[in-house]
Swiss-Prot record:
Any GO BP annotation: lipid catabolic process
Cofactor binding, note field: Binds 1 Ca(2+) ion.
Protein name: Basic phospholipase A2 canebraxin B
Function comment: Snake venom phospholipase A2 (PLA2) that shows presynaptic neurotoxicity. PLA2 catalyzes the calcium-dependent hydrolysis of the 2-acyl groups in 3-sn-phosphoglycerides.
This enzyme's EC code(s): 3.1.1.4
SMART domains on file: PA2c
Any one of the GO CC terms: extracellular region
Length: 138
């Protein structure tokens, strides 16, 4: 179910924030969010539960926590200013929400890069049904 929802949202939001986050991920990891991260582990993609499976999944868990602190922002749809230059992601000036969302995405993309050496292809299309147990606190 999570996979179908993500694909539907990405098709609708071709010019939206999710495309920006994908560009950051690709810039840092050289991998497209779909298929490499959109369905990875228990937290990469829409929603999440249980314990993160590894360092990559933990990046997504922390990203979810970051978004959780922005309850009054439209984290899935706000478009924010940013640039990709000289090996760095730089968030630009925008509304408070845009700047915070950009920072959440920047930090997550950089975390995914740092976790590349432990990426496990076995978690790439991990079924939600295997994500059990209590979720960690942010």
């Amino acid at each position: 179910m999570r996979a179908l929802w993500i694909v539907a949202v990405l098709l609708v939001a071709v010019e939206g924030h999710l495309l920006q986050f994908n560009k950051m991920i690709k810039f840092e990891t050289r991998k497209n969010a779909i298929p490499f991260y959109a369905f990875y582990g228990c937290y990469c993609g829409w929603g999440g539960r249980g314990r993160p499976k590894d360092a990559t999944d933990r990046c997504c868990f922390v990203h979810d926590c970051c978004y959780g602190k922005l309850a009054n922002c439209n984290t899935k749809w706000d478009i924010y200013p940013y640039s990709l230059k000289s090996g760095y992601i730089t968030c630009g000036k925008g509304s408070w929400c845009e700047e915070q969302i950009c920072e959440c995405d920047r930090v997550a993309a950089e975390c995914l890069r740092r976790s590349l050496s432990t990426y496990k292809y076995g978690y790439m299309f991990y079924p939600d049904s295997r994500c059990k147990g209590p979720s960690e606190q942010c």
